[in-house]
Amino acid sequence: MEAVIKAVLTGYPGETSKKDSKKKPPATSKKDPEKTPLLPTRVNYILIIGVLVLCEVTGVRADVHLLEQPGNLWITWASRTGQTDFCLSTQSATSPFQTCLIGIPSPISEGDFKGYVSDNCTTLEPHRLVSRGIPGGPENSTTLTYQKVSCLLLKLNVSLLDEPSELQLLGSQSLPNITNITRIPSVAGGCIGFTPYDSPAGVYGWDRREVTHILLTDPGNNPFFDKASNSSKPFTVVTADRHNLFMGSEYCGAYGYRFWEMYNCSQMRQNWSICQDVWGRGPPENWCTSTGGTWVNQSKEFNETEPFSFTVNCTGSNLGNVSGCCGEPITILPPEAWVDSTQGSFTKPKALPPAIFLICGDRAWQGIPSRPVGGPCYLGKLTMLAPNHTDILKILANSSRTGIRRKRSVSHLDDTCSDEVQLWGPTARIFASILAPGVAAAQALKEIERLACWSVKQANLTTSLLGDLLDDVTSIRHAVLQNRAAIDFLLLAHGHGCEDVAGMCCFNLSDHSESIQKKFQLMKEHVNKIGVDSDPIGSWLRGLFGGIGEWAVHLLKGLLLGLVVILLLVVCLPCLLQIVCGNIRKMINNSISYHTEYKKLQKAYGQPESRIV
């Protein structure tokens, strides 16, 4: 039965008869068996019918389990990584997706972890420039970032249902060096490591495959090994794939100043020595000097001048023997930077706050995997290797600009404006131009306003229509790219390369979205060029005097109005005075002439002059 089912699924039975084995394969069958289609060939259709009949007769039912759909892959990508751009790279069939993201260190604050940790990390042991085990050292101390990071990771209390997805990065940025003990960058000294023991895990080295091999093949050195089930509990080696590029002070940052410590080194067996929990070949003094320390016999005094003058007295008697190493710790990371991954908080995968990732060289997780081992790692964020066009525009828009030109106070046309254009005919234009030029000019301005209203409404309808079409084209484009990416992924995962499917490696999809967006924006800006200048005097004053306030504009308008009134009075007052004087003179002349005529009439009729009223 199993052989029949295998033959149905693969097209090759489990065992071949001798008669069939003597047959030569056809000349056209030169493909790799791994690339054989999963569906049966035409010859096996009879076997399919036989299996179906057999299942119906025996009552065997094949239940179909519908898996819950996880949602859109790219929406999940964007929400988890905080990125809207990505690229696909068909580098290998085993990992066809390669992101264009890189890791960058980010300052860590307890406010970012609100709701994700069980307690705060306010009381952290400071890192002294000279340890308390060395008498006479200065009371200078600082808190490096790794102490806060390790404390927060140990207090994570939000568990994940599944292991966090791993992201393959192009790389990650190294941490800055500590060049001034009094001004340490906020992300300096943020590297941590994960060890299944209470001591530093320098014994594992940094090779991911080597660490995995040791933990899987040597149960004695594997703290995750369960003797009852004779198997190891699942663990995750978080060391970078290209570990030689992401290790040591080149990646975690170098301490520009020596952090003096005193620790014991002794020779345990032939050609093997141990210094502070780290084993190595050779005598212990070689270990000490190779890591920047100084071998001490009984006592030695060191005079330091950086970052300030002080004296360090390293005494071997403090170690309980007559010799030791005085200087930097010999591990790549300080002992406090190693997090014990056997603690209860790491038995299950833990969630990190949004947009915060565990970055380990060229690998990243949006969470802490269960039982992590290796390093070095730090908490940071992901970004594109180069900013895209949208990010560049945002940066330029938010940058400080000088000499900003203020726009005129032009208001856009209202939606309720009249767009009914009724032009006059030739006869009306001729008679209006000859008999009433003012009426013709007013009618022309009215029709121009209606034409502007019609143009704005027409342009708004056009841009709205093009915007809807552009949204449809964008959604179709995204669907095509998503389907093509899914098809390529499935083909590569099943070992089918470019030579199997025509046009697979070359997929040309024209992209004029940037040009369309620019033209679409130009259309919107072109519509906004039609407007009504409701305050021409204020606009003229703003353009004349630059960026003045509104109160100054109103003041200048008042002064300008008063000046215009004064000018009008100066121009018109002589005329008014002349007219008034002329009228007065005319009245006087009329009165004198009337009196003269009256006297003549009196003389003519001989009436006495005294009776004149």
Curated annotation (Swiss-Prot):
Alphabetized SUPFAM superfamilies for the sequence: Virus ectodomain (SSF58069)
Positions of the UniProt region annotated as Binding to host receptor: 184-233, 268-294
All ranges on the Extracellular side of the membrane: 63-559, 581-613
Site (Cleavage): R408, S409
Lipid attachment site numbers (S-palmitoyl cysteine): C572, C575
Glycosylation site list: 120, 140, 157, 177, 230, 264, 271, 297, 303, 313, 321, 388, 398, 460, 508, 589
GO BP annotations listed: fusion of virus membrane with host plasma membrane; symbiont entry into host cell; virion attachment to host cell
Region (Immunosuppression): 481-497
Key word Transmembrane present: yes
A GO cellular component entry from the record: virion membrane
Region (Fusion peptide): 425-445
InterPro entries per the UniProt record, alphabetical: RSV_p95_env, TLV/ENV_coat_polyprotein
Keywords recorded for this protein, A-Z: Disulfide bond, Fusion of virus membrane with host cell membrane, Fusion of virus membrane with host membrane, Glycoprotein, Host cell membrane, Host membrane, Host-virus interaction, Lipoprotein, Membrane, Palmitate, Signal, Transmembrane, Transmembrane helix, Viral attachment to host cell, Viral penetration into host cytoplasm, Virion, Virus entry into host cell
Disulfide bonds: C87-C506, C121-C151, C191-C252, C265-C275, C360-C377, C417-C453, C498-C505
Cleaved signal peptide residues: 1-62
Residues spanning the membrane: 560-580
Region Disordered, residue ranges: 14-36
Keyword Signal: yes
Entry similarity comment: Belongs to the Alpharetroviruses envelope glycoprotein family.
Name the UniProt record assigns to this protein: Envelope glycoprotein gp95
Annotated source species: Rous sarcoma virus subgroup B (strain Schmidt-Ruppin) (RSV-SR-B)
Lineage of origin: Viruses, Riboviria, Pararnavirae, Artverviricota, Revtraviricetes
